[in-house]
Swiss-Prot record:
Annotated HAMAP family: NusB
UniProt record similarity statement: Belongs to the NusB family.
Repeat keyword on record: no
Gene name as annotated: nusB
Name the record gives this protein: Transcription antitermination protein NusB
GO MF term list: RNA binding
Annotated Pfam families: NusB (PF01029)
Keyword vocabulary terms for this entry: RNA-binding, Transcription, Transcription antitermination, Transcription regulation
GO cellular component: cytosol
Function: Involved in transcription antitermination. Required for transcription of ribosomal RNA (rRNA) genes. Binds specifically to the boxA antiterminator sequence of the ribosomal RNA (rrn) operons.
Domain of life where this protein originates: Bacteria
């Protein structure tokens, strides 16, 4: 039926289609809607995965990652901090994460391990990024790149570390009702 036939038959016209910007059909953000820092986290995750799985040299990983399509849209300074800071501080990051794990590191997916490194590193060193943003970004990374329920594990670990690493900020959010106690 054409629009004229719909009117003649007494049918209601279809409502105008809503414009959805920045989302895919599944509701995930399109690449174009991601911030430069979100992109930096994605590239850092890919690079950290190469480090954890292949034990590749950080300099080689860095050069390889910078040549990937879309890297020019990422915040290169944030990527550098996440990649090199996580690799250099791996032992300290693991020491903070380990008490919250219910299994050995060897049993954790390298994706979830790398996402937790990113989260803990940002909690400690990127104080300009609110803790809830760090947590949400890491959950989104785990959803996009990790296993089926990996994001829940990442959420539990990072949510457990947030009060320890960002005590004043978490407490202020809890007092204002922005975060659960």
């Amino acid at each position: 039926m054409t629009e004229d036939n719909n009117k003649a038959a007494g049918a209601k016209p279809r409502p105008a289609r809503q414009v959805r910007t920045g989302l895919t059909s599944t509701g995930a953000r399109k690449a174009s809607a991601k911030s430069n820092r979100s992109r930096a986290r994605e590239f850092a995750l890919q690079a950290l995965y190469q480090h954890l799985v292949g034990r590749n040299d950080p300099t080689e990983i860095d050069h390889f990652t910078r040549d990937l399509a879309g890297f020019h849209k990422a915040d290169a300074a944030h990527y550098d901090a996440l990649l090199h800071g996580s690799i250099e501080g791996a032992e300290q990051l693991d020491a903070l994460i380990r008490p919250l794990l219910d299994r050995k590191f060897e049993e954790i997916s390298p994706i979830e391990h790398a996402v937790m490194w990113i989260g803990v590193y940002e909690f400690q060193h990127c104080l300009d990024v609110p803790w809830r943003v760090v947590l949400n970004e890491c959950i989104e990374l785990a959803k996009e790149f990790g296993g089926t329920d990996g994001h829940k594990y990442v959420n539990a670990v990072l949510n457990g570390l947030a009060p320890q690493l960002r005590a004043a900020e978490v407490e202020a959010d809890r007092a204002s009702g922005k975060a659960r106690a």
